[in-house]
Amino acid sequence: MSTITLLCIALAGVIMLLLLVIKAKVQPFVALLLVSLLVALAAGIPAGEVGKVMIAGMGGVLGSVTIIIGLGAMLGRMIEHSGGAESLANYFSRKLGDTRTIAALTLAAFFLGIPVFFDVGFIILAPIIYGFAKVAKISPLKFGLPVAGIMLTVHVAVPPHPGPVAAAGLLHADIGWLTIIGIAISIPVGIVGYFAAKIINKRQYAMSVEVLEQMQLAPASEEGATKLSDKINPPGVALVTSLIVIPIAIIMAGTVSATLMPPSHPLLGTLQLIGSPMVALMIALVLAFWLLALRRGWSLQHTSDIMGSALPTAAVVILVTGAGGVFGKVLVESGVGKALANMLQMIDLPLLPAAFIISLALRASQGSATVAILTTGGLLSEAVMGLNPIQCVLVTLAACFGGLGASHINDSGFWIVTKYLGLSVADGLKTWTVLTTILGFTGFLITWCVWLVI
């Protein structure tokens, strides 16, 4: 099948999905699965393999996020029902004011994003975003959009995240220099993203019922409702902060140990197990069960009801995120990404813009930032021969920032952000997609300026 035909099929799939979700109001989970099936058949994937590809796409995404979303949702619900999120938000709002609180939370997200994967970190911070927004009486999007933007920037551009690490190997870039330059460029990119998010947030966007309930702006279900007595004596700032910092610190310890300790070290396996996001969140949830619930007089049944009330909302996020993974997997298996990359490679572009444009096109066409970055690295691995070490790093970063832009409906991260922030698909495209594209182009332009200077 020709490249043009594959690209037309992929484009038609995206348009059909948007029409189904935005115009026909079809539930995104169903729409994603239906369009994935039709695109797979149209792209020539054998009928007997279509089901396997769709299951692999669902499993590939949910294998990494289901447990994290479930545990993170229960931890967040415990913190929220105890009054801890509002307690923390009130403290920082008094100290900093609303505007500086948004900036401070964005700065904290920058440092959190270095050792912690984007989806894990965002899920951990979600209850804090809700708490701050509730106290400030503003949309959680005003906090969540810059936070998610800076965390994704760090995720695609700074080791030890998989995209930049693997691309560095393919493009012969030094990991140390990549870390230093990646962080240095991510700082001004984050500043631009912060102000871009402020401009985007000047418009009011409707929130989903689930987020309205979380913000206590709509009647909650009986089992999810917060008893007034639960918040009479809310936990202190130090306790709430500890419950958020502990899983992050544990994950950081696992990441650092994998980097610094030799593979033969007897403690490495144990530290990596404890430092996995799943185990770190389980530890934090057990601590919350004791410190926020039992020690404060909640009954076992009441505690169980509160934890269980987090799961219906989490299930929606999980299913839609998994369906987004199915759509992305179908696009990858159809060969649209490889065909597009080969076509772009034939165009005589300078090396740095080529790395960015190929990666951005791959990101837009098949959804995964990591796949876009790795594919670009493989295509340009021979082209970087003869470059000096810093130039190799800059080519790597150009590919990374290409993978940052154009997050939309074929990206599982798009569904995580929009569902947690209560956005419709149309509003997600107007906010999150626009912001990631601004961040990607900003990162590339700064990288190109450095290239011209050296």
Predicted feature locations:
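Juxtamembrane helix-boundary/capping and inter-helix hinge elements in multi-pass membrane proteins
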Residues: 43-45, 80-85, 95-99, 132-143, ...
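Alpha-helical transmembrane segments of multi-pass membrane proteins
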Residues: 98-113, 137-156, 174-183, 187, ...
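Membrane-embedded alpha-helical segments and adjacent helix-loop junctions characteristic
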Residues: 47-135, 297-385
